[in-house]
Amino acid sequence: MNPWTVVIHAQAEAELLSLPPDMRARFLRIAEMLEEFGPGRIGLPLVRPLTNKLWEMRMQGRDGIARAVYVAVQDRRLLVLHVFIKKTQRTPSNAISTALKRWSGVQ
């Protein structure tokens, strides 16, 4: 069976690079786990479903909480659409709409 691959949208890559180093390291670790084991074998507290086909990677660091919204696409690829620092309890609706816009632009 082919392994999974995590692909980062160009705008999400810029957002990822703006995160503090400890959160970037957590993102890389979760991405490695998703590639190695597949999305079906990784769950809370590292990833959780959002809406439709969107999922979020959950990263916590010294400076707060960050999330990376991703979707599974063809050929066993996970496409990271949006990365942001979370400031409230709920995932902001504008973060979800940003991810959906980027996803529709890729399709």
Enumerate the predicted regions with their spans:
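ATP-dependent carboxylate-activation loops
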Residues: 81
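Hydrophobic/aromatic beta-strand elements that line small-molecule binding cavities or substrate pockets
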Residues: 68-70
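Basic, Lys/Arg-enriched alpha-helical interface segments
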Residues: 1-65, 74-77, 85-107
